[in-house]
Amino acid sequence: MEIVFVSENENKIAEAREILLPLGFQSIFCGVTCRETGLTFTENAVLKAQAAVGSVKDVPIMADDSGICVDALNGMPGVLSSRWSQDGRNIDLLLWQMRDVPDVHRTAHFVCSIACVMPNTEVRTVSSVWHGRILHAPDGTGGFGYDPVFLPDGYSVSAAGLGSDLKNRISHRYKALRLMSSLLKRTYFSCHA
């Protein structure tokens, strides 16, 4: 089963590749520039997938928009996660904003929305979340983005310390890609095998 996964983020591409292959998908990865003007993760994922429609034919086109929502910051950075600070030091800004927040109020969750534009231009979307807490300092050397300061519920190390094998079986991106792959297998690929 072949799909196109659209992203300009090399880290997302690597994760998507690791997740999609065991789910039975051969993926072509494509970088398409798209302004993220949506107010939600789903709107941005749709914009990204639709941006590739003119350059790809006859296969479903998937795109991801994801980020972290911190309860003590009223859900921010949210859709602004990748551009939360002006200088790219997103973790530093987040930790500074959380400096006086006690542990009990450091709850957060990652969100991943996947949009898929079908060859007939029909759009399908799914979303998933991964709950946890914001640490007081970065921990771990793996992952990317906010992984070093995100402690997933039920774990004693940050997402950056889990290792890619475990992270890619429990994360928000894994859950969303698994949901979308199941949807595509039941609908599109059952008719286009």
Swiss-Prot record:
Pfam families: Ham1p_like. GO terms for cellular component: cytosol. Binds 1 Mg(2+) ion per subunit. One of its GO terms (biological process) is purine nucleoside triphosphate catabolic process. GO terms for molecular function: dITP diphosphatase activity; ITP diphosphatase activity; metal ion binding; nucleotide binding; ribonucleoside triphosphate phosphatase activity; XTP diphosphatase activity. Its cofactor is Mg(2+). It catalyses: XTP + H2O = XMP + diphosphate + H(+); dITP + H2O = dIMP + diphosphate + H(+); ITP + H2O = IMP + diphosphate + H(+). Keywords: Hydrolase, Magnesium, Metal-binding, Nucleotide metabolism, Nucleotide-binding. Mg(2+) binds at D65. The keyword Isomerase does not apply. Substrate binds at S7, E8, N9, E10, N11, K12, S66, F144, G145, Y146, D147, K167, H172, R173. InterPro entries: dITP/XTP_pyrophosphatase, ITPase-like_fam, RdgB/HAM1. Its EC number is 3.6.1.66. It is an enzyme of class 3 (hydrolase). The active site is at D65. Pyrophosphatase that catalyzes the hydrolysis of nucleoside triphosphates to their monophosphate derivatives, with a high preference for the non-canonical purine nucleotides XTP (xanthosine triphosphate), dITP (deoxyinosine triphosphate) and ITP. Seems to function as a house-cleaning enzyme that removes non-canonical purine nucleotides from the nucleotide pool, thus preventing their incorporation into DNA/RNA and avoiding chromosomal lesions. Belongs to the HAM1 NTPase family. Homodimer. This is dITP/XTP pyrophosphatase. The lineage of its organism: Bacteria, Bacillati, Actinomycetota, Actinomycetes, Micrococcales.
